[in-house]
Amino acid sequence: MKRFFCVAITVALFSVSATAQEKFPWQDTSLSRTERVENLLSMLTPEEKVGLMMNKSISIDRLGIPSYNWWSEACHGVRQGGYTVYPQPIGLAAAFSEKLVYDVFSQVSDEARANWNRTDHNDPKLFNVPMGVTYYPGNPELTFWCPNVNIFRDPRWGRGQETCGEDPYLNAVLGVQTVLGMQGNNDKYFKTHACAKHYAVHSGPEPLRHSMNVDPSNRDLWETYLPAFKALVKKANVREVMCAYQRFEGKPCCTSDRLLIDILRNKWGYDAIVLTDCDAINNFFNRGQHETHKDGLSASVDAVLNGTDLECGKVFMSLTEGLKKGLIEESVLDQHLRKTLMGRFELGMFDPAEMLPWANLGPEVISSEKNNDMATQAARESMVLLENKGNVLPLSKSLKTIAVVGPNADDIELLNGNYGGTPTDNHKHSLLEGIKNAVPGTKIIYQKACELNDEYQTVHHLQDFNDGKGVLVEFWNSEQSPFEGETPAPVKTGYYNELNFSTFGAWGFAEGVSNDNIAVRISGKYTATFTGEMKYTLSSDNGYVLKVNGQVVEENKGGGRPRGFGFGRRVEYKSFPVEQGKDYDVVIEYRRGKGQFAMLRGDICERKLVDFTDLANEVKQADAIIIIGGISARMEGEGGDKQDIELPKVQQMLVKAMHSTGKPVVFVNCSGSAIAFGSVEGQYDALLQAWYPGQGGAKALADVLFGDYCPGGKLPVTFYRSNNDLPDFLDYSMKNRTYRYFTGVPQYAFGYGLSYTTFSVGKGKMTAKSAKIGKSDKPYSVVVVPVTNTGKCEGTETVQVYVKRLGDEGAPIKALKGFQKLTLKPGETKRAVIALNSEAFEYYDDAIDELAVKPGRYQILYGTSSLDKDLQSFDFTVK
């Protein structure tokens, strides 16, 4: 009965409005898609055409076409709450496994389709939707703005965690698998749309992306910044490409004829949708941003004429005026609208459900145990063992006492990273919980010890308000301020011990509270438990008012970047005096601004300088100490970057204090980027890079720490020794950046990663030592490398092949061109077989403004990391 019910509902939900079925030729599935698109296009008014060229596409009620929101996210799982959360892409990249990435994103798209199947697409709310409505993502649809295939050129960039690292080849091959997994392998329909973003040359600094210009050399453009985009277009048939915020060669990317027409359309033959990042068109004319256009009309017309099909925003509404003034022809709009309409037909939005291959995917797929198992396995494969002195790891499960300390140990939100969804409650487990579950007979001493990046201990007092109930929070959805005149009843109230509200996540500010016209009042009585300065920190998108005993302590009118929002910046604390035993009535009032997102976060607390003396004495009874630290997506993400790459000072202090105990110290680093450990080198016995591992991270980490899984991950980025190794963040030249151009000595190299077992890499062979330039599908040569597991446990080793062009000063020092992951039992030998095709020998040719195979002498290097000591080589010639 259950199976029949799901399928029956699905058939109803996939169809367009019943009042419009079988009325028009565009609904006739016996016609070609091109014929159907042309028929639908012919029935639309100019205003309707414009309304369909924006992210929140209007409904065409007379034709039975519901509104559609093109914006959904699936960076490492469907972003909304209740879906499986996999490791961040930077962690998936560390697995060096094309199959793993494909399998993960096949599950992601399954969950997306299952959600689409259970959604009522004839809901009256989807009709009578005019132009200019709010376009924030709500219920996920079928078009997902992933993957991010920008090059992680600088470890300070906040969004590097969304990418597959610093190497163009690795980004390309894993990006291709992401797209194939998302879009499915059906010949007639796409399961979902993937989107290659942010096209192109986009990697921070985040605060400047709406106003900056980048002008890389043509060589860097073609050899570093474009290869992944080219691969997604030509090898994966990606159906959406997002143009980036910044200017490229003086023009906003969304008006760059070179990027969008010359390269994307003409050179690569791209035939699908180009869309903007959200509010990117506004940047063209907003004061203090690009200021390349005088107004929204000129910006919109220019964007469309130069290759942009769909806007995330509302500025394209002005295209109706452009039509009337003759600034743009309706036939031009038709050229662009054809692509977006074709996209909806290709997704099966206008076809009966029984025609679609995924109609049987029901809600049971979403956050299933099968998907949780995949998320856990992906997390295992993502972890990279960087140090293991004296084989401290794996830890014995028979240890009597283990100390677990550090700011990330018991933080469940940490696991999700940037652009992460929220797993179901049964899949929410902290890393600390995973350790406890793995060794139930072991005594665990736990202390948070410190905050991520703060040398002061914070004593929180929100829970002490209102006689221990916490602060009272009242929520309104009202166009009028509820703080002036007669106060309407709030839509929701509750007592809270934390202030952390935003329109991100499953419920927005709170369940039952709309994201529109939000107003919040926080209030309570506090009886002071000390005499001194009570600290507070507040940050919001639109300011706030703080009152104590009826007096305004601070009125923040908003504007500018919210303070205290992490991203490597120090939280700003202010204060008001308190006296022990006295009562203080505190009120905070906030209203949502007009920006893209809403946010109100804060705390009321004491601040004391940290001292680890007592902690060090306490953990001396432990047999081993596990520090779970690093950073979190609160310190790196969209909108903000890390200020530096050093391990935060307070954690340096913690590491040194734990090392002073004489006990084995294992440091588990959680981050989406490279962290410099030079300041504490030699102060830890083992170092494990865990990234942001998703909902399976707790079990995965425990499996690795206690030997149930042998780590085999490899770094997809370079771990530098200090900030001094980094060029200017604003400089988009690749000189001295990433392993391909870095002339210094890294702390941990790209491609590096240890195991609990040992491997011997034998002498490799090549099927050919030279090749002739010419058109051929055959590889130029195949590298065959024997690998033997010489240790005592099963493990994986990844053979990597790099190419170096000799006699070319501007070429990379070496560049990854192939890899193969081998799983070997003790004593077993297998061969890695890695083909090098013509693309492995392509470099920029200014005569054709494109990549081309270059004749000359090459070195083919193979081994287990990018370090010279781990590589052997062949000579190779291209004639």
Model-derived features with residue positions:
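A conserved ligand/cofactor-binding region detector
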Residues: Q872
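Bacterial Sec-dependent N-terminal signal peptides
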Residues: M1-K23
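Glycoside hydrolase catalytic-domain context in secreted enzymes
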Residues: V16-K535, S539-Y843, E850-D868, T877-K879
